[in-house]
Amino acid sequence: MTITPVYTTFTPTKTPIKFFMAGLTFLIAHISHADDGRTDNQEPINQEIATLEPIINHAQPELLSHDALTPKIEPILAQTPNPAEDTLIADEALLLDNPDLLNHALNSAVMTNHMAGVHALLPIYQKLPKDHQNGILLGYANALAALDKGNAKKAIDELRRIIAIMPEYNVVRFHLARALFMDKQNEAALDQFNKLHADNLPEEVRQVVGQYRQALKQRDSWTWQVGMNLAKEDNINQTPKNTTQGQWTFDKPIDAITLSYQLGADKKWSLPKGAYVGANAQIYGKHHQNHKKYNDHWGRLGANLGFADAKKDLSIETYGEKRFYGHERYTDTIGIRMSVDYRINPKFQSLNAIDISRLTNHRTPRADSNNTLYSTSLIYYPNATRYYLLGADFYDEKVPQDPSDSYQRRGIRTAWGQEWAGGLSSRAQISINKRHYQGANLTSGGQIRHDKQMQASLSLWHRDIHKWGITPRLTISTNINKSNDIKANYHKNQMFVEFSRIF
């Protein structure tokens, strides 16, 4: 494909914004980063808590973009390129010999937001002698190219330089506001969008600006999550299948109807330069109507300070947790968590966390523990309808007064999420862990305890089945623990329909 230049000069006004803002979609995506799978082993009957996502709660990315509430520009171009071609081929020698032609060609590509043309012509334009270059045009083309490649910071620098020279040009101001939005500089982005909104804009442009302003307000609004499921759960007391082993006799496995619930709220307050502070609260647990001594309820409060831009989100959080087991106070936990969410490129994302905590056991004071978790995940998005996750974890629990309860756990996990044709969606997850304890106990035959654990789940839902913003999900899960400690061998299955909503 060759370039047909449009002979106009680079004199942006308020009207060219119509050309590149003709098409608009409003894309909403949510990545639920659930808990990272930290398991408290200091429980009566060694029961592991599973909330609404009972198996691999390390990272639950939804499909599509990681950023939420991001309007997406789909411009109408002055030319109609061949859909089979991704790039434009330009005669570099011809254009360098004709600086006016090159200026007009790049100007045409910039003013129509024709990114293939901008990417093809910009490297050639940069080879022109300085006295043949238009500095504003060069900066604007650099900014658009940087935005197209996701380099919001470079685009912001270029666009701020231009807007300082030409503050009345709203087409430039719009791209500056959009770059600030991408870089999560929320206060600065809102300031630019407010200036645009106050001007005399065409109605279609005003609607786009309004959607960005609304998206920015929602970034700082309260987010609520409510969910519950009712399930028939087997072996809630997690006892061995064989209740008599040698001189030991164990309770029979108990099957029960389990109500699992979760309620959460969180909020961020944006600060300058992409910084923010946040607060969150959660309650979750399990209720067994006919076996209340196995009821398990948790509450958590957290406050965090962070920094986010288009590529990364860095956060440090302090939190406190309270747990009640069988309606009695069981444990208190205080901790600090550091996390890094980094978008490597549009296809890959990494999630990393370090969590250090102190647990106080009110039922068994000698079981107080110091805990450390290291967690990392890599997510691959081959397209907008699929993702794959691979993760690894290391958890160290030290119980100073009882080495037999101290252990280290190493694990790997994987997940696959898919949107199928016809509206069906699925998520499959599996994790494999090994625990190595520091001491022996009576039921391990005097040997140091070693456990192998496998957890797996499959969730299915239909995207067209929803009511009041709730899409029911069918989940089947299994949890197998094999140990040389005879009381720690168990196998339990669950099947339930989950109802949850985020708003």
UniProtKB/Swiss-Prot annotation:
Q: Which UniProt keywords apply?
A: Cell outer membrane, Membrane, Signal, TPR repeat, Transmembrane, Transmembrane beta strand
- TPR repeat ranges are 136-169
Looking up SUPFAM superfamilies in the UniProt record yields: TPR-like (SSF48452)
Instruction: Map out region (N-terminal domain) in residue numbers.
Output: 38-220
Q: Any idea where this protein resides?
A: Cell outer membrane
TM region(s), chain numbering: 222-232, 259-270, 275-285, 299-308, 313-322, 334-343, 348-358, 372-382, 387-396, 410-419, 424-434, 454-463, 470-479, 493-503
Q: How does it sit in the membrane?
A: Multi-pass membrane protein
Cleavable signal peptide: 1-34
Q: Where does the UniProt entry say this protein principally localizes?
A: membrane
For this protein, the record's InterPro entries field holds: Slam_C_b-barrel, TPR-like_helical_dom_sf
CC terms in the record's Gene Ontology section: cell outer membrane
Location of region: C-terminal probable beta barrel:
221-503
Entry remark concerning the domains of this protein:
Consists of a soluble N-terminal domain and C-terminal probable beta-barrel in the outer membrane with 14 predicted beta-strands.
Functional note: Required for correct export to the cell surface of some cell outer membrane lipoproteins (tested with TpbP) upon heterologous expression in E.coli and probably also in Moraxella.
Q: Which family does it belong to?
A: Belongs to the Slam family.
Protein's UniProt name:
Surface lipoprotein assembly modifier
Species name? Moraxella catarrhalis (Branhamella catarrhalis)
